[in-house]
Amino acid sequence: MSLLFSRCNSIVTVKKDKRHMAEVNASPLKHFVTAKKKINGIFEQLGAYIQESAGFLEDTHRNTELDPVTTEEQVLDVKGYLSKVRGISEVLARRHMKVAFFGRTSNGKSTVINAMLWDKVLPSGIGHTTNCFLRVGGTDGHEAFLLTEGSEEKKSVKTVNQLAHALHQDEQLHAGSLVSVMWPNSKCPLLKDGLVLMDSPGIDVTTELDSWIDKFCLDADVFVLVANSESTLMQTEKQFFHKVSERLSRPNIFILNNRWDASASEPEYMEEVRRQHMERCTSFLVDELGVVDRAQAGDRIFFVSAKEVLSARVQKAQGMPEGGGALAEGFQVRMFEFQNFERRFEECISQSAVKTKFEQHTVRAKQIAEAVRLIMDSLHIAAQEQRVYCLEMREERQDRLRFIDKQLELLAQDYKLRIKQMTEEVERQVSTAMAEEIRRLSVLVDEYQMDFHPSPVVLKVYKNELHRHIEEGLGRNMSDRCSTAIASSLQTMQQDMIDGLKPLLPVSVRNQIDMLVPRQCFSLSYDLNCDKLCADFQEDIEFHFSLGWTMLVNRFLGPKNSRRALLGYNDQVQRPLPLTPANPSMPPLPQGSLTQEELMVSMVTGLASLTSRTSMGILVVGGVVWKAVGWRLIALSFGLYGLLYVYERLTWTTRAKERAFKRQFVEYASEKLQLIISYTGSNCSHQVQQELSGTFAHLCQQVDITRDNLEQEIAAMNKKVEALDSLQSKAKLLRNKAGWLDSELNMFIHQYLQPSR
C-alpha cells in the first residue's frame, strides 16, 4: 500500500515538474499571444455590451409612455462608443509585435534576422545588400510570397535566390519602399506568435532618416542596432537613434556587436575590446539616449556572430550537428550569447508590445465602460426617482378615489333625505295653497265677465271660457303662492348639491360645472285640467218658485233625497251593506232600525204617494183648513203666495240666471277640485323630486367621469411602475455588467500591463 502511494506521489511530482518545465521553456512571445487573445475577447464582450446598451437606451428614449429618463445625447454617445470599440477591435485583430533592425550597410542585419528565423529567408552575405525595407511576417499557407507597397498581387517566392532576384529586378523599389515577405509559419516557428521583423537598408546610404522613422518606426516595439564589432559605433548610427529617441518615449533598443567571431583570432585582446565596446555602448544607451540605467544596460548589449548561428541552425535543421564545419574558437559562448539575446529580446518585446499595443486601448476601454456605467447609473437613478414619484401619485389617486367613494355615499344619503323632506314640504305647501284657492273660488268666478245667454250654443262657449279663466286664475294664484318660494328653495338645494359635490371634481372641471350641469329655469306645472274636470257639470237655470213643493222638499231633504222622495221610490228603505267587514265583538244593528233622515224620507215619500193617488186628499185637507181658519185668511195667504210667485217670476232675468249658473258651478267645481288636491300636491312634489334628482344625477355623472379617469390613471401608473421596474432592473444589470467588464480590464492590466515585481 505504501509502495503504491509513493509511486502515485512520484507520478504527480513528475507531472508537476513537466508542467513547470513546459512553462519555463515556453516562449515569452506567448505572453503577447495570450494577452492579445484576452484583450480581443474583452473587446468582443465590450462591443456586445455596448450594442445591447445602445439598443436599450434607444428603446427607452423612444418609449412615449415614460417620462424622459435618458437623453438623445446619451443615446448618440453610446452609439459613438460602439463605433469606437468596433474600430479598436479591428485594430487589435491586426496588432502584432514588431522589431526593427537598423545599422550600417553590410553589418549583417539580414543575417541576424535569418539566424533568428533558423532559415535563410532574406538574401544575405557577399553581394547582397538590402536596398529597401523588408517586412517579414508569417502566413498560414504553405508557400511564401511577397507583396510590394501599393499592390495586392502576391508574388510567389520559393527560394532566397528567387527573392533576391525579385527584389533586384523591381526598378520601382527604392530605399523608402516597403516589401512584405510572407513566410510559412510551419517553416519558421518564431513567426507563429505574431512577430514581425523589419529589415532596413543601411542608415549610412540615405539622408531620409526622418521619413523612415515616421513611416516604419513609430509602431516598432523593439529596435536592434546591428553594429560591426570590428569597429566602433559611428556617428551616423548614433544620430539615427537620437532621432528615434526624440519621436518615441524611451524606445527599447538592443545593440548587437556582430561578427564577434573575428575576435577569436586575437584572444589576447578579446576582453579589452569587449570592455571598450561595452563602455561605449553603455554610455550611448544611458548617457546619450537615457533609455535604460546602467544596471539594465548589460541586458541590452550582446556580442554575437549571426553568421555562425545561422550556419549552425541550418545544419541542425538538416539533421547535422551544430558544431559541424569550420567554426572559430569560442563558438559555444557566442551561441549562448545569441540565445541570451533572443531570450532577452523576446521578453522585452512581449512586454513592450503588450504595453504599447494594448495599454492605450485598455485605458480607452476602461473609460468607455465607465462612461456607459455612469449613463446606466444615471438612468437607474432617474427610473428609481420616477418610480417613487409614480408610486406617490398612485397612492394619492387611490386615496382620492377612496375619498370620493366615501363622500359620494354620504352625500347621496344626505341629499336623498333632503330631497324627500323637500318634496313632502312642497306637497304640503301646494295642498294648503290649493285648498285656500278652492275656498276663494267664488271670487275668481265672480271676476269672470262675459255675456251670458241661456241658449245652448252661447252657454257652451261660456262654459269653455269659464274653464279657461278658472284654470289660468288658479294657476296664477298657485304660482304666486308657491312657485317662487319653491323655485328659490330648489335653486338653493341645487347650489348646495353643487357645492357639496364640487370638491370631488378636478379643479379644471369645477370652473366649468355650470356648463356641464344643465340648470334650466324651473317652473311648476299644476295641470288642473278644469275643462275635463268639470265636463260633467249640468247647470239648472230653469225658474223654480222658492215656496214650491219641489223647492221645499229640496230645502229640507237636500237634492238627492228630494229626488228620491218626489220620484216615488220603494216604501221599504233598504239599508246599504257595510263596505268593511263587521266587527264580531260589537252587537249587530237590528234590521228594522232606521236613521232619522231615512224616516223623514219615508214619511214624505208616503205622503207624496198618497196625494198622487187621489185628489180626495186635497179636498179633505182644504176642508179641514177652511173649517179651522176661515176663508179670509186662506184667501190672503193665496194672495200673498201669488204675489211672491209673480215677483220671483218677474225677477228671474238673464242676470239672475248667470248668478245661479256661477253659484252652481262654484259648488260643483269646488267639490271636484277637492278631489285632486292630493294629486296636484303629489304632482308638484314629483316635479321637484325629478328636477333635484336630475341635478344630482348630472353631478354624479361628472363624479363618475372623475372616478373613471382616476381608475384609468391608477391603471396607467401601475403599468408605468411595472415598466420602470423592468427598466430599473435592466439598467442595474447593464451597470453591473459594466463593472464586471471594468474588473476584467483591471485584471488584464494587472496580469499583462503592470511590471512584475
From Swiss-Prot:
Its EC number is 3.6.5.-. Residues 258-261 are annotated as: G4 motif. Residues 103-110 are annotated as: G1 motif. Residues 199-202 are annotated as: G3 motif. PROSITE patterns: G_DYNAMIN_2. Residues 129-130 are annotated as: G2 motif. GO terms for molecular function: GTP binding; GTPase activity; GTPase binding; identical protein binding; proteoglycan binding; small GTPase binding; ubiquitin protein ligase binding. Phosphorylated by PINK1. InterPro entries: Dynamin_N, Fzo/mitofusin_HR2, G_DYNAMIN_dom, Mitofusin_fam, P-loop_NTPase. The modification Phosphothreonine is found at residue 111. Residues 93-342 form the Dynamin-type G domain. One of its GO terms (cellular component) is mitochondrial outer membrane. Residues 30-94, 359-385, 722-753 are annotated as: Part of a helix bundle domain, formed by helices from N-terminal and C-terminal regions. GTP binds at residues 106-111, 258-261, 305, 307. Residues 626 are mitochondrial intermembrane. It catalyses: GTP + H2O = GDP + phosphate + H(+). Residues 288 are annotated as: G5 motif. The keyword Transmembrane helix applies. Belongs to the TRAFAC class dynamin-like GTPase superfamily. Dynamin/Fzo/YdjA family. Mitofusin subfamily. Mitochondrial outer membrane GTPase that mediates mitochondrial clustering and fusion. Mitochondria are highly dynamic organelles, and their morphology is determined by the equilibrium between mitochondrial fusion and fission events. Overexpression induces the formation of mitochondrial networks. Membrane clustering requires GTPase activity and may involve a major rearrangement of the coiled coil domains. Plays a central role in mitochondrial metabolism and may be associated with obesity and/or apoptosis processes. A helix bundle is formed by helices from the N-terminal and the C-terminal part of the protein. The GTPase domain cannot be expressed by itself, without the helix bundle. Rearrangement of the helix bundle and/or of the coiled coil domains may bring membranes from adjacent mitochondria into close contact, and thereby play a role in mitochondrial fusion. This is Mitofusin-2. It comes from Rattus norvegicus (Rat).
